Amino acid sequence: MTHTDCPSLLSFRQADESDLLELVRLRDAAARWQIERGIRQWKPGELGRSHFEAILREGEAWIATLGDRGPTVGAWELWWDDLPAWGEQPPVAGYVHRLMTDRQTAPPGAGLVMLAEAERRIARSGRALCRLDCLSDNPRLRRYYEDAGYTVVGEQPSKNGDGGKQYGVTLLEKRLREQ
């Protein structure tokens, strides 16, 4: 199976409060997977239920499943501004955060399919850009996004992140076609 087989397999829905524990589970599992591979991006237990409750109030979280009723294969957050990384900006972009897949259920290429769905959601809202960031010292993730059509547009050396910690991030964006 290739990522081109994936679109017909995945369904997408906006997350609600009944999904909070699933979002935490996905995030923690993704963090453990990263650590096992020497990737310093996330830590298990770093973001809990209260984080995702805030996202549901202030932005959007999306769930991807195999078919309409199948198991969860991944999720992502969609924000309509991102002051910590991008500062004050005109409303021309959507910001994707915490793109994560379930390594037990996600078919190959599911991450790219979910990213494309996030891009469609942003384009349908009338915004022309999809923006995201990754740790400056994570070249593997940066390459993943560049291979998906994203361009590096800057560095933010001291992003104020979750829990008040500061870290450097690479800023990437992709111009979207109208949907």
Regions found by a protein language model. Give the residues of each.
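Hydrophobic "lid"/C-terminal helical patch
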Residues: 23, 27
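Short glycine/proline-centered loop/turn elements that form peptide/ligand docking sites
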Residues: 111, 115, 137-141, 157-165
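Conserved catalytic-core motifs of GNAT/GCN5-like acyltransferases
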Residues: 131-134, 146-169
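Conserved N-terminal entry element of GNAT/NAT acetyltransferase domains
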Residues: 1-18, 178-179
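Structural preference for long, well-ordered alpha-helical segments within the folded cores
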Residues: 22, 117, 121, 143-144
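Conserved GNAT acetyl-CoA-binding A-motif
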Residues: 115, 122-134
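Acetyl-CoA-dependent GNAT
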Residues: 17, 28-106, 112-117, 121, ...
